[in-house]
């Protein structure tokens, strides 16, 4: 008999919930089981033959481990008589076709130890124009069933998570930082490996276009003094119109009033206009 112990790579503790299989060199499955918090006893393997320990499904939040090739050598007593006990050796090279005897290393206690690394996910919320980390966005991650997995406010560093089960997820921006438009939902997939998997969501700035036009020609009208105030009466921007539209960037979503202070010579002052900047960057 021999033993298989499934462990956490980060702390070497026993790891339940992984589906494992032992296959012979022809690829035939000899036995399968789900790991528990105790080593698994394996019997019925043949002395002298090589086998492969394969992880079919990792425990939630863990990466799939590499295959381990091993063989059983029957023990003998001092007189050369075979015993019903065995020694277990594992192959240190990944080339199972070409190896030397020195490539086989003896395992302690006839136990094959397979370790799983944890999954690592990094979420970056970035400014579309600068590609820099963007603080102040409220974000949530949901799984395929719509269950909330994590919620946080972005900072000037990526958001890091460990032990996220492999699978498909949706990243949603609940609220954008002031002056930015809410990004579209983003689907992503976490793979069962131990690498840091990075996903990025970009926010564009809100750009408000203000045109002062002649009502008869619909052409841009220079020379008007205009001001935008928020719902509290705080002045947001003031300018003199030109031959082109005026743009205001990073304007927080909310309600505003556009007022003409002075009209160009020969024109009457227009009535104030109330408008709303939506979180999507659109105007109403």
Give the residues covered by each predicted segment.
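Solvent-exposed loop/turn and edge beta-strand elements of beta-rich ligand-binding domains
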Residues: 1-284
